[in-house]
Regions:
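Charged, often Cys/His-bearing segments associated with DNA-binding zinc-finger transcription factors
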Residues: 1-49, 424-458
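Basic, low-complexity intrinsically disordered segments
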Residues: 2-4, 46-146
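Short, conserved catalytic/metal-binding motifs centered on acidic residues
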Residues: 29, 69-71, 85-89, 109-115, ...
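Active-site- or DNA-interface-adjacent structural scaffold in DNA-acting proteins
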Residues: 102-278
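Flexible, glycine/threonine-enriched loop-and-boundary segments that flank and lead into catalytic domains
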Residues: 271-292
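Flexible loop/turn segments at secondary-structure boundaries
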Residues: 280-283, 307-308, 317-320, 351-355, ...
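Electropositive, glycine- and tryptophan-enriched low-complexity nucleic-acid-binding patches
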Residues: 286-334
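Helix-centered, glycine/charged polyanion-binding patches within enzymatic domains
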Residues: 336-410
Length: 458
């Protein structure tokens, strides 16, 4: 596949006399050290089959795989949007070196919308490759060993969607506005749009709910449903005269509006956002947040050091135990390059009653049959909770802005890859600090470092 930027050995003539990035930055910086250890060539080889081929004679050359992969890593590692990561890349020479640049660039690497198209091209399998290569790098650096990766902790959490808090009055008004906008866009004249009455009813319902006047609130909601039903039926009648393409485009929104009109508070599988019908309501028993709106995701981490070895979404809000086999299957696939198979899974009581062939499942519901060593491992189960917290606060897992169920799946994998990148940077910084301490001690006589009664024996 042709790439737009030249290789380091093929710099254009106007860049030959510019100072190279490696002469301007600190080569001991953790990001620089990590850029030397990540297997970029293997990553490009793994992702190339999933990308469209670019002919040598026509078409704009594609962006380098290392550039796009590096931007996706940095986006989630530093909790940035697509627009912000491109702007920060322009200002940061370390980020440019990490993504393969040779000299300092003064233009943004790509349009932010290109990252959206690249995510769609990579798909879930391509994002799994990004995550797998962070695990391979940690293993190659000997930050984790095979024995460490064979024991995993598995848990689930909620990846919230970027939607407003769903209320009946707001959803009904949004649906009415959307249908009126679609009719206007395609030249369909409605009998009445209720442009004044609709927003007024929404405000009244909100005021009554705030004052706990629920009988009056329900009266306003009934009126809102009546207005939405009138607009919906009027548009359905006049849609029969339109072209098939117009009917197909508007039919999707008519179906959602009909679903919203028919649902009641106690119904199952309700619609919580007009633009995101895949959103589900989940309760995790949190006092501060009784209900969360998004998708259930599973996280698998190494039992001792907390490296993420599996992350995926589970649409439909399944029982936690029903997700265990799929979660361990994904972890097995991500660990195949390091020749490791998960042998022990440490879980909470939400996974009771489920077994996976070839994997020992440990939870505290087996108290009468557990050995002392197994109990020590079960006490490590809570180690997954701070990992989930950092994923949400530092790597963007707390709010997903990507579209659809595919966006949910891609987002959680990107968050996991970003977390592992931060994990590797911390490991490199720790090794650097440790080496400085060792060098300082080796250059200082033991009599000055330690009291006479504590001198080290060689």
């Amino acid at each position: 596949m042709r790439t737009r930027r030249p290789a380091a050995e093929q710099l254009p003539a106007d860049e030959l006399f510019r100072s190279r990035l490696e002469n301007q930055i600190d080569l001991r910086h953790p990001l620089v050290q990590l850029s030397h250890r990540l297997p970029w060539s293997a990553l490009e080889q793994a992702l190339s089959p999933r990308l469209p081929a670019t002919t040598g004679t026509g078409g704009r050359p594609a962006l380098p795989v290392r550039l796009i992969a590096g931007l996706l890593y940095l986006k989630h590692a530093y909790d940035l949007s697509d627009e912000a990561v491109c702007e920060r890349w322009l200002e940061n020479p370390y980020w440019q070196f990490f993504t393969g640049e040779v000299v300092f660039q003064t233009c943004v690497p790509c349009d932010p919308s290109s990252l959206t198209r690249w995510r769609q091209r990579l798909g879930e399998a391509g994002m799994e490759e990004l995550l797998a290569h962070t695990i391979n790098t940690a293993h190659a650096m000997k930050a984790v060993d095979a024995r460490e990766l064979s024991r995993v902790i598995v848990d689930t959490t909620v990846q919230e969607k970027a939607i407003a808090h769903p209320t009946d009055s707001r959803l009904l008004e949004v649906a009415r506005k959307k249908l009126v906008l679609l009719a206007k866009r395609h030249g369909i004249a409605l009998r009445q749009t209720y442009a004044r009455q609709g927003p007024a009813l929404r405000r009244k319902a909100g005021r009554h709910a705030h004052a706990r006047q629920f009988k009056r609130m329900r009266k306003e909601l009934r009126r809102q449903r009546t207005l939405l039903g009138r607009v919906l039926r009027d548009l359905q009648r006049k849609l029969a005269q339109q072209e098939p393409s117009v009917r197909e485009r508007i039919g999707v929104w008519l179906e959602r509006a009909q679903r919203l009109l028919a649902q009641r508070p106690k119904d199952k599988q309700k619609l919580y956002a007009l633009h995101a019908p895949e959103v589900e309501c989940m309760s995790k028993g949190k006092a501060r947040q009784p209900y969360e709106f998004g998708v259930k995701v599973g996280i698998a981490v190494s039992a001792r050091k907390g490296l993420i070895v599996g992350a995926r979404s589970f649409p439909g809000n399944p029982y936690d135990g029903d997700t265990l086999a799929e979660q361990l299957e994904q972890a097995r696939g991500l660990l195949q390059d390091v020749d490791v198979i998960p042998q022990v899974a440490i879980v909470d009581l939400g996974y009771r009653g489920r077994d996976v062939e070839g994997v020992q499942i440990l939870h505290r519901g087996q108290a009468k049959t557990l050995t002392r060593r197994q109990w020590r491992w079960i006490k490590r189960r809570q180690a997954v909770e701070p990992v989930i917290g950092h994923l949400k606060q530092d790597c963007r897992l707390n709010r997903c802005h990507l579209k659809g169920a595919q966006g949910d799946a891609l987002h959680v994998l990107g968050c996991a890859a970003g977390y592992n990148l931060r994990w590797l940077l911390r490991w490199i910084a720790f090794l650097r600090a440790l080496l400085q301490v060792v060098r300082a001690r080796s250059s200082t006589p033991s009599s000055t470092m330690w009291p006479a009664n504590m001198a080290l024996e060689v």
